[in-house]
């Protein structure tokens, strides 16, 4: 059972029934972290696009599921927050987000919204030629000549001929809008009030104001993903309050 795990111990973020079949597909190493949702689990358990692994493999062979502009080939490939999933045959598009219970949720979006994706910069490295490589939260990276900071979010084009070009930028700074993707405030959209560096190995703290309730709350910078500047880009990104 190297490629499977027991449903009862599957990540809660998957949001799947735990008392049906005994085993479920394990996510292969790749994009996102260990809580990434295998595409077959998304297609079968969440969306009902396929009924079993056999159907899932057929759909993938026919290149009928596209993630972030690329056809998915392996049923155990993981998808995660802010990924764009398209089904060309039906013309449907979705953005993967997290709700307030930390579960993956699938938000229908239109074709225009599906033409780009948002990613968080985790760190940067200098590569050959002096160019800057932005290392992104989902495990991918992109080269640039411009200056961006760790913690910022960038928007990458998924259009043919422009794929992975940076078309927008949301800085990690007070006054800008962020979505929380972990902890007890998961799914909340708020405005950053203050970023508090913490010495040593402890995570830095961030204080935000909940745009829905008006209340202030605190989280750690690892859970913060920028989603707008002075005004929230909530409608554009399909983020639910």
UniProtKB/Swiss-Prot annotation:
Family annotation (SMART domains): KOW
PANTHER family listed in its UniProt record: 30S/40S RIBOSOMAL PROTEIN S4 (PTHR11581), SMALL RIBOSOMAL SUBUNIT PROTEIN ES4 (PTHR11581:SF0)
Domain S4 RNA-binding: start-end pairs: 37-100
Alphabetical list of Pfam families matching this protein: Ribosomal_S4e, RS4NT
Region forming the signal peptide: none
Organism: Methanospirillum hungatei JF-1 (strain ATCC 27890 / DSM 864 / NBRC 100397 / JF-1)
Keywords assigned by UniProt, alphabetized: Ribonucleoprotein, Ribosomal protein, RNA-binding, rRNA-binding
GO MF annotations in UniProt: rRNA binding; structural constituent of ribosome
CDD domains the UniProt entry points to: KOW_RPS4 (cd06087), S4 (cd00165)
Gene3D superfamilies: 2.30.30.30, 2.40.50.740, RNA-binding S4 domain (3.10.290.10)
Similarity section: Belongs to the eukaryotic ribosomal protein eS4 family.
Listed name of the protein: Small ribosomal subunit protein eS4
Protein's GO biological process: translation
Cellular component GO terms held in the UniProt record: cytosolic small ribosomal subunit
Keyword Membrane: no
UniProt keyword annotation of Iron present: no
């Amino acid at each position: 059972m190297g490629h499977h795990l027991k449903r009862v111990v599957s990540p809660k973020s998957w949001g799947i029934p735990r008392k049906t079949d005994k085993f479920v597909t394990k996510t292969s190493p790749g994009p996102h972290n260990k809580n990434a949702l295998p595409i077959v689990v998304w297609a079968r358990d969440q969306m009902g696009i396929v009924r079993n692994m056999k159907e899932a493999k057929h759909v993938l062979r026919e290149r009928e599921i596209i993630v972030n502009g690329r056809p998915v080939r392996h049923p155990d490939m993981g998808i995660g927050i802010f990924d764009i999933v398209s089904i060309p045959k039906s013309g449907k598009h979705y953005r993967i987000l997290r709700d307030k219970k930390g579960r993956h949720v699938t938000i229908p979006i239109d074709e225009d919204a599906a033409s780009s994706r948002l990613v968080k910069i985790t760190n940067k490295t200098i590569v050959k030629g002096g160019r800057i490589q932005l290392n992104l939260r989902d495990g991918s990276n992109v080269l640039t000549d411009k200056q961006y900071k760790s913690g910022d979010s960038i928007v990458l084009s998924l259009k043919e001929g422009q794929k992975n070009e940076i078309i927008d930028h949301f800085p990690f700074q007070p006054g800008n809008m962020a979505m929380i993707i972990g902890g007890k405030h998961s799914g909340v959209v708020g405005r950053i009030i203050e970023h508090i560096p913490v010495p040593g190995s402890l995570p830095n703290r961030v204080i935000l104001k909940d745009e829905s309730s008006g209340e202030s709350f605190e989280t750690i910078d690892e859970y913060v993903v920028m989603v707008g500047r002075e005004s929230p880009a909530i409608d554009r990104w399909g983020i639910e309050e």
